[in-house]
Curated annotation (Swiss-Prot):
One of its GO terms (cellular component) is cytoplasm. Its EC number is 2.5.1.6. It catalyses: L-methionine + ATP + H2O = S-adenosyl-L-methionine + phosphate + diphosphate. This is S-adenosylmethionine synthase. Mg(2+) binds at residue 18. The gene is metK. Catalyzes the formation of S-adenosylmethionine (AdoMet) from methionine and ATP. The overall synthetic reaction is composed of two sequential steps, AdoMet formation and the subsequent tripolyphosphate hydrolysis which occurs prior to release of AdoMet from the enzyme. GO terms for biological process: one-carbon metabolic process; S-adenosylmethionine biosynthetic process. It comes from Picosynechococcus sp. (strain ATCC 27264 / PCC 7002 / PR-6). Binds 2 divalent ions per subunit. GO terms for molecular function: ATP binding; magnesium ion binding; methionine adenosyltransferase activity. Keywords: ATP-binding, Cytoplasm, Magnesium, Metal-binding, Nucleotide-binding, One-carbon metabolism, Potassium, Transferase. Its cofactor is Mg(2+); K(+). K(+) binds at residue 44. L-methionine binds at residues 57, 100, 260, 291.
């Protein structure tokens, strides 16, 4: 008997309060690393009505105007009208950054292996910036090897922002959320059950002042300008039974930091796989690549994606764990949920042979310190909204499939009978 179930993932637009904070944190990271690639950064941001607070730890030789960076990012997102309670030009921006603890710095700068063995291996010079566990995931549900629910939710959120910024739907505000419920049968997506969009909007739309008429127009416009375009060419499409919910509270005029406070690192499931895979709990934004919450999660995605792309599994989850100041992972685990076509013990051996999972090795393989300067001062901030994985609009090193051939070659004789 086939098993039928529903799975839901959500996304938010770049104007969501928490995502404003993530983007400012990563804009600061970009600016600092572009000027001094060896910087240590842990930038946290809080927003509320008319207020931005930048806090955290920072060790750098760079001279960065953090207030200017924050205002520019807020303007780019679309908060330019003080009448909305939050504006790039009028909000207060406070900065309270401390230097990184020397107790942490000594462990990150000189790994425990090097101190014990006096090794000259440069990849052992940088230990993990903290203890912890990280996950990466990939599956064959979409061309970008992402779970379908989060892929669709992100595409809807991005399209929602695009039609606002282009002026196609000028009455939309920057704040918004999307949610997609996918129908599965025997683990395969077969349909779309529900699409939910909540979007900030103006009090009136043209001559329309009645809220019932306003909400009807918003729903009709979003169906034609946002939802249908996202599903063009989709392998799983809309149907007559698909439910569409738009602004189900009835109104969404007050939004952004005026409607809700924001904080860096509160959208970690949206940043990753939409709840489809496990999560180690660590956020990404505002953290330099010595923080394994970020860099090791990217490496795990790289491993999982290449495994699935090589046809070795239909879905793959990779976990690593670290001890602070120690370069080599404490543990590495690969889970393929019964879909692996080769011996899993042999697969783990090959992964550990060909994928660099030490923090310094990850940084070197992906060039994580230098990408901000190489890309005109912006790299991390472009992932701070709409996800860090499966981004076909960005050139992300952990999304490359350059390990597929070596995996196939090494595992050609390890096929499970």
């Amino acid at each position: 008997m086939s098993r039928r179930y529903l799975f839901t993932s959500e996304s938010v637009t770049e104007g969501h309060p928490d995502k404003i904070c993530d983007q400012i944190s990563d804009a600061i990271l970009d600016a600092v690393l572009a000027a001094d690639p060896s910087s240590r950064v842990a930038a946290e941001v809080v927003t509320n009505t008319g207020l931005v607070l930048i806090t955290g730890e920072l060790t750098t030789q760079a001279n960065v105007n953090f207030i200017q960076v924050a205002r520019q990012k807020i303007k780019e997102i679309g908060y330019t009208n003080a009448d909305n309670g939050f504006s790039a030009n009028s909000c207060s921006v406070m900065v309270a950054l401390d230097e990184q603890s020397p107790d942490i710095a000594q462990g990150v700068t000189s790994a425990q292996e090097q101190r014990d063995k006096l090794s000259d291996d440069q990849l052992d010079e940088i230990g993990a910036g903290d203890q912890g566990l990280m996950f990466g995931y990939a599956c064959n549900e979409t061309p970008e090897f992402m779970p379908l629910p989060i892929s669709l939710a992100h595409r809807l959120s991005l399209k929602l922002s695009q039609v606002r910024k282009s002026g196609e739907l000028p009455y939309l505000g920057p704040d918004g959320k999307t949610q997609v419920t996918v129908i599965y049968e025997d683990g395969k997506p077969v349909g779309i059950d529900t699409i939910l969009i909540s979007t900030q909007h103006t009090e009136t739309i043209g001559a329309l002042t009645d809220n019932t008429e306003i909400q009807a127009k918003i729903k009709a416009d979003l169906l034609e300008k946002v939802i249908k375009p996202v599903f063009v060419g989709a392998t799983v499409g809309l149907s007559d039974s698909t439910k569409f919910l738009v602004n189900p509270t009835g109104k969404f005029v007050i939004g952004g930091p005026q409607g809700d406070s924001g904080l860096t690192g509160r959208k970690i499931i949206i940043d990753t796989y939409g709840g489809y895979s496990r999560h180690g709990g660590g956020a990404f934004s505002g953290k330099d690549p010595t923080k394994v919450d970020r860099s090791a999660s990217y490496a795990c995605r790289y491993v999982a994606k290449n495994i699935v792309a090589a046809g070795l599994a239909e879905k793959c989850e990779v976990q690593v764990s670290y001890a602070i100041g120690v370069a080599r992972p404490v543990s590495v685990m690969i889970e393929t949920f019964g879909t692996c076509t080769v011996d899993e013990d042999r697969l783990l051996e090959v992964v550990q042979k060909h994928f660099e999972l030490r923090p310094a090795g990850i940084i070197q393989a992906f060039d994580l310190r230098n990408l901000p300067s190489q890309r005109n001062g912006r790299f991390y901030q472009d992932m701070a909204a709409y996800g860090h994985f499966g981004r076909t609009d960005l050139d992300l090193p952990w999304e490359r499939l350059d390990k597929v051939d070596i995996l196939k070659q090494e595992l050609a004789t390890a096929t499970v009978a």
